[in-house]
Amino acid sequence: MVIVFCGVLFMAETASILCPDKKVLLPDIHAGCPMADMITAEGLRQKKIEHPGATVVCYINSSAEVKAESDVCCTSANAANIVEKLPEGRKILFVPDQYLGHYTSTRTGREMILWPGFCPTHTRIKSRDIIRLKQEHPQAKVVVHPECRPEVIALADEVLSTGGIRRFASSTTATEVIVGTEIGMLHRLRKENPDKSFIPVSEQAVCPRMKLITLENVLWSLEEMEPEVKVPEEIRLRAKAAVDKMLEVG
């Protein structure tokens, strides 16, 4: 069986980690994640030496090598639940997204050491734009992704993962929703909820790496059966342990 991943590299790697018997293709091998590139396995190993005994909580938006150096993975949806279930008093090192880590720390009341990574796309979402849009659309609800800066999160009615934003868009009684996440998400929201108006906080919130995946290179990838993403077995097993721990705990 073949999996063609229309996303970025860490997503294809995660598919390879979980499904080693399947051929995983990424139509453009240059479709990486800038945030995932802000941390290396060697850098994380050094940080672990600086903080002995710390539990490493790794956002799923990271490379296979970084996952392999971590104790447990998390998503934006379950990060708080994962952290809450760690033993009280345990030192926590959260990588690589400082803003998801900050939001998770605020929600759980747990102090954490935060790796200084971030999503460039979500940092283009500014609080001043939300303030302006709320003035223009006073009845609108504001929903943002937890990869946004704290001052943006403070202005939101809801802070949700991508899946959570979809569910909120369907369930809310509001007819206007101001959305703070990657702008491609709005296409799906509008398609699924044609009776509602979805307003992007910023037209600049575009992930250029994701946009490298096109219908043309998906077709090419299927025809040529490449480029294949295959995580080396030694790394795969260690990374899978962190993912399995997330599924067990979260």
Language model segments and positions:
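Active-site loop-to-helix "anion-binding N-cap" substructures in soluble metabolic enzymes
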Residues: M1-L160, G164-V179, L186-H187, K191-P194, ...
